[in-house]
Design a protein with these regions (language model features):
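Inter-domain helical "communication" segments and dimerization helices
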Residues: 1-97
């Protein structure tokens, strides 16, 4: 499934909301995690950087971050993107659960 199967305006609205969020909290993390499949990998990379930058202000446990990275990895495997697979495996290995 790709983002072409979804209403483009709704996808854009979610993307804009996440890009405009200065401080990410649990809601933004949940929204991102649950809507990963509607974004391309370039957008996911940028949004994951926002997650990483907000980790010190978010009240989440590492299991939530682990699930996000595991889901991103699944998408990277589907796209056969070896560079991103390596990148996110390194991130996954750094997480302490």
């Amino acid at each position: 499934m790709n983002n072409e199967s979804f209403n483009k305006e709704e996808v854009q609205e979610i993307k804009e909301y996440l890009f405009k969020a200065d401080i990410w909290m649990y809601y933004e993390l949940s929204l991102f995690t649950n809507s990963l499949f509607i974004f391309d990998l370039d957008v996911i990379d940028i949004l994951f950087k926002k997650v990483s930058n907000s980790l010190n202000t978010m009240v989440v446990n590492n299991t939530d971050i682990f699930m996000l990275v595991a889901n991103i990895l699944s998408l990277c495997f589907q796209k056969n993107d070896l560079n991103r697979i390596r990148k996110y495996i390194k991130i996954l290995n750094k997480l302490s659960i």
